[in-house]
């Protein structure tokens, strides 16, 4: 799961909006909140796409300052309630409902803020869910009307499709032997 300039899933993940708060008044950016030509004032809260908010959250106002243009609020996908649900039963969490690009956003968030506990919890979630995805891809009858498959984010859906296709190819190859 790498970032790719031409990957549509990566573009869609980058367009997910994050809540942020401006640390300074910025002249001329009022159009971001529907006020063209006006400034965005300090402490203004907005939802901006990840591609923009990520840059503004990591760039200092000037080289002598430790203050960034804005601070990002923790998105819902990493709030304690979601992480506790993932720790308790990763198979029961509807990642697609949280965001269709859950793992991509976690990866992008992890690049901004190093949080080893978050990464470990999400990796455990992916491991548990990958095993279940593999089990479903091996048994075509099991996939009919199964709620778990509707909870997969886009990365997991691609994993399911790839695994299913590989299993079909393997069965086809074994029949020729």
Swiss-Prot record:
Locations listed in the record: Nucleus
Disulfide bridge map: none
UniProt xrefs under InterPro entries: GINS_A, GINS_bundle-like_dom_sf, GINS_Psf3, GINS_Psf3_sf, PSF3_N
Gene Ontology annotations of biological process type: mitotic DNA replication initiation
Keywords: DNA replication, Nucleus
Presence of the UniProt keyword Nucleus in the record: yes
Name of one Pfam family that matches: Sld5
Subunit text: Component of the GINS complex which is a heterotetramer of SLD5, PSF1, PSF2 and PSF3.
Task performed by this protein: The GINS complex plays an essential role in the initiation of DNA replication.
Protein name in the entry: DNA replication complex GINS protein PSF3
Organism name: Candida albicans (strain SC5314 / ATCC MYA-2876) (Yeast)
Highest classification ranks of the organism: Eukaryota, Fungi, Dikarya, Ascomycota, Saccharomycotina
Gene: PSF3
């Amino acid at each position: 799961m790498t970032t790719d300039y031409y990957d549509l899933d990566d573009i869609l993940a980058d367009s997910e909006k994050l809540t942020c708060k401006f640390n300074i008044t910025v002249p001329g950016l009022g159009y971001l909140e529907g006020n063209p030509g006006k400034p965005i004032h300090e402490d203004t809260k907005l939802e901006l796409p990840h591609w923009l908010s990520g840059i503004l959250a990591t760039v200092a106002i000037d080289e002598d300052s430790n203050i960034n243009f804005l601070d990002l609020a923790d998105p819902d996908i990493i709030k304690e309630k979601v992480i506790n649900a993932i720790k308790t039963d990763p198979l029961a969490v509807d990642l697609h409902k949280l965001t269709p690009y859950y793992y991509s956003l976690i990866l992008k968030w992890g690049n901004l803020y190093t949080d080893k506990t978050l990464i470990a919890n999400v990796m455990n979630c992916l491991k548990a869910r990958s095993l279940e995805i593999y089990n479903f891809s091996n048994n075509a009858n099991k996939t009919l009307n199964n709620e778990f498959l509707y909870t997969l984010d886009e990365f997991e859906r691609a994993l399911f499709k790839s695994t299913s296709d590989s299993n079909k190819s393997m069965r086809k190859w074994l029949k020729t032997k």
